From Swiss-Prot:
Organism whose genome encodes this protein: Helicobacter pylori (strain P12)
Location(s) in or outside the cell: Cytoplasm
InterPro entries named among the record's database cross-references: RNaseH-like_sf (IPR012337), YqgF (IPR005227), YqgF/RNaseH-like_dom (IPR006641), YqgF/RNaseH-like_dom_sf (IPR037027)
Protein name, UniProt field: Putative pre-16S rRNA nuclease
EC code: 3.1.-.-
């Protein structure tokens, strides 16, 4: 199975590829780096993930890239790790919340649903860029 994550300072959005369908999973709420990396490690083990797709912004966001790479090194995972450009994935995910009212959009942003929808965009990009070549 393939899992994607959108690593943020407060939440980690999670999405999985199940039978060819990209689905958002419950986001990991991040209290600190070690707790979040343990939670992600546990999820990867529980779901028997073979490939972890990680969203990274373009090179102009050097600090963010370093932070994401450092966090991923803390994750206990022996499978394949693939980094995919995440530029605008959060904006695209937010556009998917158009049907919600302002209050519910704010809630979706706070509870991690938006982050997991962003992880869905990252996983879709992986499928388009990597899986189509196989």
């Amino acid at each position: 199975m393939i899992l994607a994550c959108d690593v943020g300072l407060k939440r980690i959005g999670i999405a999985a590829l199940l039978n060819g369908v990209v689905l958002p999973l419950e986001a990991i709420l991040r209290h600190n780096r070690n707790q979040a990396s343990r939670d992600l490690s546990d999820l990867l083990r529980e779901k028997n993930i073979q490939v972890l797709v990680v969203g990274k912004p373009n090179e102009s966001y050097a600090d963010t890239n370093v932070r994401i790479e450092h966090f991923i090194k803390l994750v206990d995972f022996t499978g394949e790790i693939v980094f995919i450009n995440e530029d605008n994935s959060s904006i695209e995910a937010y556009d998917n919340l158009e049907h919600l009212g302002r209050k519910n959009k704010r809630l979706a942003t706070k509870d991690g649903r938006l982050d997991s929808l962003s992880a869905c965009r990252i996983l879709e990009r992986y499928c388009q860029q990597v899986l189509k070549n196989h």
